[in-house]
Amino acid sequence: MDEIVVRCPVALGAFLKIAGVASTGGHAKLLVQEGAVTVNGQPETRRGRKLAAGDVVGVGEWESRVCSSAT
């Protein structure tokens, strides 16, 4: 599982772009609307959901843990 360091809280759509899973905001929106994204094992349909450190985001076989930066 990857660990991606971001400033928390971060929106789900922005996290998908930072992680390289979505190439654009529109692509992130499409992934979320299609139900392809999970947060902590549960399907998530809100692109603007705020993620916190420790949350696990999944798309298909890919999973990553949200890690908070110190600054």
Task: Locate each region found by the language model.
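A detector for short, charged/polar N-terminal pre-domain segments
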Residues: 1-8
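A basic, amphipathic helix-loop patch mediating RNA/tRNA/ribosome contacts
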Residues: 10-53
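C-terminal structural segments of small proteins and small subunits
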Residues: 44-71
